[in-house]
């Protein structure tokens, strides 16, 4: 089989059908990943055809690197060639990722500066029965800030219908949206979504770090544990009872175990609908 076709088969085995032909020039090229947002190009690949054909590919969105070679190296020289190419691809990927994140951070800071204080009657806030807590608003979208090392690095747009979108290329892993003030020896709740965090802050008065996703609970927890070693971390997990494997509970349980901290989950009365999954859902149900 032609090496380019074989490389493309390897890409499609991981990411599904793609509509591009890899260029074998040793530099990063981007492509659309099947089932990602239309028009996005989160996939990336690097291909070499000289010597032993080899390459790498992955997704900006999902992370990770997949390595491919047309055959096993025949000698130490070929093995070293493949190793150097993989290292070069890694460096290219990291440089491009850093560039994309910096561009997104600059855009986030510009949008945040130009936005106005959020309307307390915004449809999303009304639906969640939450106060704005310093959110800003641009046109019809709420802006939720994400911070890392005290710097604004990304924004989550929340539209009136509840649709959510981060800035393209913006950093999320290890970043969070804060509510309240972190104090030595006091609790910090780490949760998924902003509305859940706002609910926890309003109910407890404690500081909250909204990690934005289940898989980001642990990275945020590690960051907070390093920077606030005297704080009392509490993972406040979602309970995705209707989803296979209950990803919210599973991720929260693993994060709490890895951090050695307390885990809290919504305590459901017997008559609560199964589709409710987080602390905000529980509060809204109780208010009915």
Predicted features, each with a name:
Residues 1-123, 240, 247-250:
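Non-catalytic accessory segments of DNA primases and related replication-initiation nucleases
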Residues 123, 132-137, 153, 234:
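Phosphate-handling catalytic cores of nucleic-acid transaction enzymes
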Residues 27-30, 140-143, 268-277:
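A short acidic, often aromatic-flanked loop/helix-cap motif at beta-alpha or helix-coil junctions
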Residues 16-20, 130, 261:
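Short aromatic/hydrophobic-glycine micro-motifs
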Residues 103, 140-229:
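Phosphate-handling DNA/RNA-contact segment within nucleic-acid enzymes
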